[in-house]
């Protein structure tokens, strides 16, 4: 059986109506509201074909039909047109990022709040994983007697700096030697792939500067992971519970239990981390059984070409995909630009 234009129109009408009303859709409703130019009897026949093809299904207690996960997937891949944000909504987003915020955590918090507000679902925002960023350049500069500044540049463009106390006998030539060895050994390496043997090599080559090296390596690690690692910001938890699909107490308990498990949420978001653009998981496409009654739309955010983390929206499979995709795409682009400004302006 072939998915022709008329079947597409009827499937689109069923999905739009069900997203808006959460009520099963009958042939008369489609005929009355969507003006497809065919009789209710013809619509019924086409709906019967769509059901046989697996795109719609009949709830036990209703004469109407609702989209299946396969139907939603066909809609997202073939029929969906992104929704335009209103001018007021675009201004809200722009102002949310234009306000002078220098803390990464506050920017991510705002991102979550705006996503939850604009979609009316639950928003998840993953803290950047700086452990996965690589060292690009290390420089130590003598600032005065017993004072030096340590500057660390990461491949994301993030710049970290820290004052440190050094022996009075230390010269800029000594600091240049330390910087040169650190760059030779650490450049292009992330914190997670720096092995003990490499640290031993560094100490061997800089044995007469051991005390400075102890402090420098400690500060380098502290500055890079000073932001809470792998934290997940959740906003709008109760938004999803307001959906009629989640009026069942047991269903609510299962979902709330999942949302309390930060490690599990991190794993869910990490699954799409290496994919640029927007990822949509519908119903049982989600690997976790607890959210197989839900859909998840995610997008990565980045600085330059380095992916730092993931943002996502969790809602029922009856999600307004056209709106959510528009919102999350807009937010990921704005978040990337804002983090680029913050991270590169930390000197």
Curated annotation (Swiss-Prot):
Keyword set for this entry? Repressor, Stress response, Transcription, Transcription regulation
Task: List S-S links within the chain.
Answer: none
Could you tell me which Pfam families the record lists for this protein?
Answer: HrcA (PF01628)
Domain of life the protein comes from: Bacteria
The keyword Metal-binding belongs to this UniProt entry's keyword annotation = no
Which InterPro entries does the record match to this protein?
GAF-like_dom_sf, HrcA, HrcA_C, WH-like_DNA-bd_sf, WH_DNA-bd_sf, WHTH_transcript_rep_HrcA_IDD
Gene Ontology BP terms: negative regulation of DNA-templated transcription
List, in alphabetical order, the Gene Ontology terms for molecular function in this entry.
DNA binding
Q: What does this protein do?
A: Negative regulator of class I heat shock genes (grpE-dnaK-dnaJ and groELS operons). Prevents heat-shock induction of these operons.
Family of this protein: Belongs to the HrcA family.
Q: HAMAP family recorded for this chain?
A: HrcA
NCBIfam families tied to this protein: hrcA (TIGR00331)
**Name of the protein:** Heat-inducible transcription repressor HrcA
Recorded source organism is: Desulforamulus reducens (strain ATCC BAA-1160 / DSM 100696 / MI-1)
* Upper classification of the organism: Bacteria, Bacillati, Bacillota, Clostridia, Eubacteriales
By which gene is this protein encoded?
hrcA
């Amino acid at each position: 059986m072939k998915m022709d234009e008329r079947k597409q129109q009827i499937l689109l009408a069923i999905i739009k109506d069900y997203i808006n009303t959460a009520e099963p859709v009958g042939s008369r409703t489609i005929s009355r509201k969507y003006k497809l130019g065919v009789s209710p009897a013809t619509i019924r026949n086409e709906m019967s074909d769509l059901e046989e093809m697996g795109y719609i299904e009949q709830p036990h207690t209703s004469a109407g039909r609702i989209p299946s996960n396969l139907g939603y997937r066909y809609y997202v891949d073939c029929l969906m047109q992104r929704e335009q944000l209103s001018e007021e909504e675009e201004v809200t987003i722009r102002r949310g990022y234009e306000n002078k915020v220098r803390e990464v955590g506050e920017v991510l918090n705002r991102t979550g709040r705006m996503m939850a507000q604009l979609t009316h679902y639950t928003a998840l925002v993953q803290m950047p994983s700086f452990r996965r960023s690589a060292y690009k350049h290390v420089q130590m500069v003598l600032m005065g007697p017993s004072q030096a500044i340590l500057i660390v540049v990461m491949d994301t463009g993030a710049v970290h700096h820290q004052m440190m106390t050094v022996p009075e006998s230390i010269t800029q030539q000594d600091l240049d030697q330390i910087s040169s060895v650190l760059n030779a050994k650490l450049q292009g390496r992330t914190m997670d792939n720096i092995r003990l043997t490499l640290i031993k090599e560094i100490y061997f080559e800089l044995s007469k500067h051991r005390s400075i090296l102890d402090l420098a390596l400690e500060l380098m690690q502290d500055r890079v992971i000073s932001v809470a690692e792998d934290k997940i910001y959740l906003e709008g938890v109760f938004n999803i519970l307001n959906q009629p699909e989640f009026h069942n107490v047991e269903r609510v308990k299962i979902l709330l239990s999942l949302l309390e498990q930060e490690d599990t949420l991190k794993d869910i978001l990490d699954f799409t981390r290496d994919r640029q653009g927007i990822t949509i998981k519908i119903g049982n496409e989600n690997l976790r059984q607890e959210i197989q009654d839900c859909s998840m739309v995610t997008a990565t955010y980045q600085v330059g070409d380095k992916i730092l983390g993931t943002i996502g929206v969790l809602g029922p499979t009856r999600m307004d995909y056209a709106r959510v995709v528009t919102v999350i795409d807009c937010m990921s682009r704005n978040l990337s630009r804002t983090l680029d400004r913050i991270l590169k302006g930390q000197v």
